[in-house]
């Protein structure tokens, strides 16, 4: 498609101007509000008797490092399956996450760590910011290849605010348990992105259908993302939990759930595939559903068997979703879900929230002993019954779906503004429209455009 000189000039300026504006505004807010916390500040840490080994850095940084790798390597490479959108998948993941980390530090800080007029930052705030970035990248997966970088940054600007608000309502007001984010991260990110995709529906997307598939090497690169996510997911779910048995139990439950979801994915993929052959799309995504489904319940006394059962069910549901649900969403509901986030994050996230409610409802002093105070402090103090905690968990799911749906709708209306740069229907899933693409890839893209023009 040929762009007019005026449109090309405006398009060229939108991204740099928005990046500079967002970074400038964020920097000013950091200067005014953000300060080191006690364990990061030189004066505060050395005031009193502290051993360096007691600093939270040495307890939290290994988990943070794993979560950080998941955000930038895992999510980025998982989305490179599109044959001609590898630069956009990894590059825009990099851009969105870098902005979301700064913006969410401010938003989450105002809600959770605002003390004496300042936001205090340290290892915990870094981990929480990564979690927020994860939700943004899940939403990105639903509109991958169909939106420009300016639209994506504005999506992140809105979504981070709503993520922080939803998280505050769930964790601070309702006091639900959701350490691994089945609700706050996966369910919120998935349905925010799906509603956004519905509002941005493209009836002429068929013009770019030939680019929506994968090729051998793009699927292979996407498997790198899968393996990174699979390996580090126990750290993702356990990073914010209390040190000791809770963190240990969370990692263990996630570990077993992932193994079970992998086996069920291979089983179902071969069962529904042609001639019993495996589909790499299923393996890349549904094998990870085990990490999503135990996000809420992993720190609870789920039991190893419960973790296996949950993971197996999540892998099966996710695989069947890719095979049967995704086509229905597109044909009947007009939801164009590029990465299938409904199958990897949406349905397993909702299932995980329901599982968390069930396990919370079964909590007893006999099962948890003195550990009940760290997992369910309100039950331990007698302020809530186990049944009441379960109902709060389920209400948290309803609140999350409400925030995600309303937020996704508002985000879609914002991104539909005509002034915002967006790829035309015939150039979706194409790197060349936003990136300098060297070598053979560029020539192939040009040849494809010439063929379309002649047709």
Swiss-Prot record:
Protein name: Ammonium transporter Rh type B
Annotated region described as Interaction with ANK3, given as residue ranges: 416-424
Keywords for this protein: Ammonia transport, Cell membrane, Glycoprotein, Membrane, Transmembrane, Transmembrane helix, Transport
SUPFAM superfamilies (alphabetical): Ammonium transporter
Transmembrane regions listed in the UniProt entry: 14-34, 62-82, 87-107, 125-145, 152-172, 180-200, 220-240, 254-274, 278-298, 300-320, 344-364, 394-414
Stated role: Ammonium transporter involved in the maintenance of acid-base homeostasis. Transports ammonium and its related derivative methylammonium across the basolateral plasma membrane of epithelial cells likely contributing to renal transepithelial ammonia transport and ammonia metabolism. May transport either NH4(+) or NH3 ammonia species predominantly mediating an electrogenic NH4(+) transport. May act as a CO2 channel providing for renal acid secretion.
Location in or out of the cell: Cell membrane; Basolateral cell membrane
Transmembrane helix is among the record's keywords: yes
Extracellular domain ranges by topology: 35-61, 108-124, 173-179, 241-253, 299, 365-393
One GO process term, biological-process aspect: ammonium transmembrane transport
Membrane topology reported for the UniProt record: Multi-pass membrane protein
Cytoplasmic side: 1-13, 83-86, 146-151, 201-219, 275-277, 321-343, 415-455
Disulphide bridges: none
Record carries keyword Transmembrane: yes
